[in-house]
Structures are given as C-alpha cells and as structure tokens.
C-alpha cells in the first residue's frame, strides 16, 4: 500500500458522510516504514497537506458532523489547515483481525480509531473506519494515484 491514495466516502448513513469531501479530503499516504498520514487534504491545486487527527476530538466531531458539511466549515477549515498540519506520520499500519480474517489496518496514534482495508484490486482498496465505543462504521474507497504528480 506504499504511496498516495485518493479517498472517496461511501454513503451509508454515517454522520461523517460528506464531511471529509466538503473539507477537501484527498485521501491517505502510506510510507514504507509502516507509518501513514491518516488524513491528507488538498490545500491548493497540486499541494497535499497531512492533518493531525488528534486536534479534533472524535466524539465531538461525530456529534456535530452536520456542521462539517456546511460552507462555513469548509471556509474555516481552509484558513485553519496550516495550524492543523501534522509534524509527521499520524498512524501505524498493522495486521489486525476482523471477523476472523487478517487484514491491513491503520491504527491512529492519538485517537481511538482504526481503519481496516480490503484489497479490491492492485489500485483500489475498500476501507472501514471504526471508532472505539461507536457501533457505526464509516466506509470509504481508496484509489492509488501516481506519486510523480505529488
């Protein structure tokens, strides 16, 4: 999975449906040392910015997710993105068991979040974000992109 992957939410009735896309979420970046940039946003055309997930208390985000789909949220986020920038990778990729199957998982460093991945083909992965203590899952798709452009 090493490289840059473009993300796309899959509508499922989860509170975060449409939130990441509204805030110009690009996807995720996986490094060869099993570390990852969990939240990668497009700041300007041709410029990707890794965001530190721990600046957003996940329970508060889930409670007020509808605000994240507004024009105001998009504007605020675009101005505050620089302050939210990660200083380095924010998650670790490991093997984890889901429904008795071993699968790749991205464990966030300072959030109770794990993203589980299933390979669709060489260039596409299905993802499921799980927040500890919350029965709802956020589903997304990742498409491999050419690193040369970034």
Where are these regions (language model features)?
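Soluble ligand-binding/transfer domains with enclosed cavities or grooves
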Residues: 1-150
